[in-house]
């Protein structure tokens, strides 16, 4: 990806495992001790809502992504979660989520002006991006 937040150990620990307000669940897909992908999620019990905050895997093997999402959905089902939200930018991720039953809910318009047309060409290709709910601070504070 041309646009992705560095998802190394330090960042993931800071973002999810040392969060002062929320407890996150993580599932990792491994093969021979090699990480093939991961998913980060949490539930909001009062709202009976689940959030998939981060998912990353090799897009050449979408079945790993599928497996991770299905495992998270099984967890949510056990917790009687009624709605699951996520935000994705890449078509291959969106395709996997749609196969599982997710659908687009809301679109927003964003207006941007570029001085550098080279940057504009890269910026508007969604395949260049990997953004998820976990990349923002939408959740606020408890």
Residues covered by each model-derived region:
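Active-site/acyl-donor-binding loops of N-acyltransferases
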Residues: 15, 31, 42-63, 67-142
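Amide-forming acyltransferase catalytic core, primarily the GNAT-like/NAT-type
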Residues: 1-53
